[in-house]
């Protein structure tokens, strides 16, 4: 599958949010990752539908709204109306995951499920045929700039095996600590959607940072092949 970069605005300069998001896309980002945190499910507060709506005016690529919130079903319609293309929900935050994934799909969005570092991939067995993507958290959610958790590679590889064995087509996405030192291992393990925040934003030139990370990922793809 094609390797894609999903720049995460969590690490961007919010005073220049639209401009920096566009720069990351010009550098090769093909999905914009929007981290939504409620201060309850994770210990941080970020953005909501108004920011998504504003970004929609200037961003043409798909937006993946990663809902790190309690009771996501209550807010899914608002994010759809604001302009979300993909909506990713945590298995750990959803009592009836099957219902939630169907709700997302019923609104015409691509449904994704997210698992925290301590959650086994086997807990997703019954919903893998319902999702467009599975997002493996390779840090504990809540803050950007954390170090990559090495065991995440085993989870990515396990998902790749499950996908092949069941002849499914969901994408494998990874979020947390993805940078020039970790991206090759992540890709070789089987991930193809790469969320990157602090590796792209907050230092140097955003376009260059995105381009270099994507090039490193695609080089690793050739090595895997």
Give names to the regions the model predicted.
Residues 139-140, 147-193, 199:
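Active-site/ligand-binding-proximal alpha/beta "capping" segment
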Residues 119-123:
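A short, acidic/glycine-rich surface segment
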Residues 105-108, 113-115, 192, 197:
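Amphipathic, soluble alpha/beta structural segments
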Residues 92-94, 116-118, 139-143, 198-201:
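Short, acidic/turn-prone active-site loops that include or flank metal/cofactor-
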Residues 4, 114, 135-138, 173, ...:
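Conserved beta-strand segments that form the floor/walls of ligand-binding pockets within enzyme
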Residues 1-88, 92-96, 103-106, 111, ...:
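Conserved N-terminal beta1-alpha1 strand-loop-helix module at the mouth
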């Amino acid at each position: 599958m094609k390797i894609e970069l999903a720049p995460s605005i969590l690490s961007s300069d919010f005073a220049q949010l639209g401009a920096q998001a566009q720069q990351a896309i010009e550098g090769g980002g093909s999905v914009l990752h929007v981290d939504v945190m409620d201060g309850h499910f994770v210990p941080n507060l970020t953005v909501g539908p108004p920011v998504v709506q504003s970004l929609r005016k200037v961003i043409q690529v798909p937006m993946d709204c990663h809902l790190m919130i309690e009771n996501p079903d209550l807010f899914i319609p608002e994010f759809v109306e604001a302009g979300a293309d993909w909506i990713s929900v945590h298995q750990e935050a959803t009592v009836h995951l099957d219902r939630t994934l169907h709700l997302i799909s019923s609104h015409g969005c691509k449904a994704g499920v997210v698992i925290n570092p301590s959650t086994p991939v086997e807990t997703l067995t019954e919903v893998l045929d319902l999702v467009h993507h599975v997002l493996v958290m390779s840090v504990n959610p809540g803050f950007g700039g954390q170090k990559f958790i090495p065991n995440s590679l085993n989870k990515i590889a396990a998902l790749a095996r499950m996908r092949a064995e069941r002849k499914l087509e969901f994408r494998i996405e990874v979020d947390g600590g993805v940078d020039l030192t970790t991206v090759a291992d992540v890709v070789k393990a089987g991930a193809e959607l790469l969320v990157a925040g602090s590796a792209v934003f907050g230092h140097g030139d955003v376009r260059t940072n995105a381009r270099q990370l994507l090039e490193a990922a695609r080089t690793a793809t050739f090595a895997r092949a």
